[in-house]
Amino acid sequence: MKTVQLGTISVIHETWLPYAAACLISYCNKIPEIKSQYKFNEPLYKYKPVEDYTDKFKDIDVFGLTCYVWNQAYNDQLMSHYKDINPQGITMYGGPNVPEDPKLAEQFAKEHPYIDIF
């Protein structure tokens, strides 16, 4: 069974609920084929120093974050750190700060080599 970690981390709000990540997890847990192959951790939502996630990253197979202008720099640090700890893990970015235009996406991929899927 693969372990999946999703999240929307706030760097500006003390209290933040990861609604989008929770909705994705809830949806996936209703599909037997997904539920039998993937275990979803509680979504990440609290800002912590990147190093505080080191132990958690060792046990995660798939890591996905929602990217906004206000959390992009922190997410970049977090994803890069995850790949250092778990180079075989799969990383995903989604959200409004991920480019859809093919030319911008190509540049984004070059600037974010630690992101596998966006």
Model feature map: region roles:
Residues S10-A20, C67-A73:
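A short, glycine/small-residue-rich beta-strand->loop->alpha-helix junction that serves as a flexible
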Residues K2, Y27, S36-F118:
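Glycine-rich beta-alpha loop elements in corrinoid/cobalamin-binding modules
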